[in-house]
């Protein structure tokens, strides 16, 4: 919410321009990874638009690049029957139940995300998982290990394209925004220091300790 002003979602309707530029990139024969969930949820518009379905079909027709659809939802029924050719990776952002409950309001619970991932695998899709943002709090290592265990209970490692880790970081201006809009949130009150990129990041030894714990669990 510190990147965009005003902090509202925008959906661009010039899809022909998008597809034309995309076809140009796909035609160069170079491996690309395209994603629509960098600053938003890839599937959040799918109740009103068929963009994700259109993209899945588009990528199924080529053999060099991949599409990643990243989400915190569990709404994938509209994607299950599509001809995807294994060129689309459905990925989920995972977190502890405490973080989901307190900081990710309106998103699918962990169990529903993992169930959707299992359904995606059954439909032939490769899947991926993002432990991002990792939030440090008392007992977090134990909680994140449980999430890893539940992830592998839901999906076998042979179906997972990748797992990524990223600790919570934010632009300095976001702290005031969180305090104003989400006064009950404590997410911005950890041991943060300014990073080389200007973002506030957890003190490096704390980050490394949590990364190492998750890597060992994975």
Q: How would you describe each model-predicted region?
A:
Residues 152-218:
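Auxiliary Fe-S-binding modules of radical SAM enzymes
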Residues 10-17, 47-51, 105-112, 139-146, ...:
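Alpha-helix N-cap and loop-to-helix initiation/capping positions
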Residues 21-28, 78-83, 110-123, 214:
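Structured alpha-helical segments in the cores of large, soluble enzyme domains
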Residues 113-173, 217:
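Conserved C-terminal portion of the radical SAM core fold
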Residues 1-91:
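Conserved Radical SAM active-site core
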Residues 18-21, 51-55, 112-116, 143-151, ...:
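A general structural detector for well-ordered alpha-helical segments in enzyme core domains, enriched
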Residues 49, 91-93, 140-156, 183-189:
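Short, electropositive alpha-helical surface patch
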